């Protein structure tokens, strides 16, 4: 009931009280604060990503502080989209020129680089799974309950040589 007496009247039938409990909800890319980027296909596809000198950052529409998550990213344009992973929401996702990408300690980020397959984060990057080719699928499994993130390519988790069961600890 409205505190201002702005109430609806049921003309026929009955109302069903439902709790807001969404299931099967899918994350999309969040266009707020993104620069140099065009969003396509319901914010599931991007074009652009840099202006030659600056990184652009894109958050998602679902934030997380606990739980387990999995998503995939298709490498459609390796020249434009270079790093994929996670970063602390408190770092902000607007364009930050010459920031150093996810490997910059500013973002608390962890991820991988499409061009060479390096893992990035903690202020550095290192060889991990080899470079991606166009249409390869990057895989990210984030386990915030156990503080781990795992990366892979085309259905295979990486251990630094393309093998299995590699985790990248301290994801938060």
Q: Where would I find each of the regions flagged by the language model?
A:
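PRY/SPRY (B30.2) beta-sandwich protein-interaction domains
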Residues: 1-172
């Amino acid at each position: 009931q409205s505190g201002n007496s702005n109430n609806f009247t049921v003309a026929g039938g009955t109302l069903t009280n439902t709790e807001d409990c969404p299931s099967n909800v899918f994350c999309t890319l969040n266009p707020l604060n993104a620069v140099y980027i065009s969003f396509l296909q319901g914010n599931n596809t991007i074009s652009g990503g840099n202006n030659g000198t600056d990184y652009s950052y894109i958050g998602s529409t679902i934030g997380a502080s606990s739980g387990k998550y999995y998503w995939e990213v298709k490498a459609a344009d390796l020249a434009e989209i270079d790093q994929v992973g996670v970063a602390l929401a408190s770092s902000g996702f607007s364009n930050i020129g010459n920031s150093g990408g996810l490997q910059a300690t500013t973002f608390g980020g962890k991820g991988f680089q499409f061009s060479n397959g390096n893992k990035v984060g903690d202020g550095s990057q290192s060889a991990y799974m080899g470079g991606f080719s166009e249409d390869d699928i990057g895989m990210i499994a984030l386990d915030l309950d156990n503080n781990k993130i795992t990366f892979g390519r085309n259905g295979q988790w990486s251990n630094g040589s393309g093998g299995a069961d590699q985790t990248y600890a301290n994801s938060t």
